[in-house]
């Protein structure tokens, strides 16, 4: 551990990459754990694709309301706050995460790149009008009639190119 700490302190540019372990420590389910992962209990093709959004709308909405409520019920843990302190004292320069819970930003980090998007914002799939996450819990229909969805990458969608450019 001491060797790692020395490397961290001596490095010129440190980027932290986080994934599901950070979210599970906050109490959120991961996707692929054999006994408790989301995809053990739910079929991703029925719930986490653009096709599901358009052809299985009610189940799509209920699934993402369930996930959003889980995020609201949880929150950043000590590890998130430690990374915030490291950013403040310039031990790390940024965080790249696969997580969509937004906990790094809630903990105070400012230089966060969310590869798969975030539950912190939602938008209409048809007209792209932005919505607050709390609005989605009560109403998933946009003023244009389209379906409101989380600002996350669904199965079959590409990762946003600007995320890679910024991350580099």
PLM features: residue spans?
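Conserved catalytic core of sirtuin-type NAD+-dependent deacylases
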Residues: 1-168
């Amino acid at each position: 551990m001491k060797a790692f700490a020395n490397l961290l302190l001596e490095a010129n540019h440190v980027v932290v990459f986080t994934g599901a372990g950070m979210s599970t420590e906050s109490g959120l389910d991961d996707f692929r754990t054999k006994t408790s992962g989301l995809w053990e209990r739910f079929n991703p093709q029925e719930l986490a694709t653009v096709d599901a959004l358009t052809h299985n709308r009610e189940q799509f909405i209920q699934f993402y309301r369930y996930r959003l409520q889980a995020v609201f019920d949880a929150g950043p843990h000590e590890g998130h706050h430690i990374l915030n302190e490291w950013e403040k004292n310039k031990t790390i320069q940024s965080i790249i995460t696969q997580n969509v819970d937004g906990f790094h930003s809630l903990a105070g980090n400012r230089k966060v790149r969310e590869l798969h998007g975030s539950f912190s914002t939602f938008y209409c799939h048809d007209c792209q009008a932005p919505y607050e996450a709390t609005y989605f819990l009560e109403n998933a229909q946009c003023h244009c009639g389209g379906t409101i969805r989380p600002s996350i990458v669904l199965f079959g969608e590409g990762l946003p190119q600007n995320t890679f450019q910024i991350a580099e």
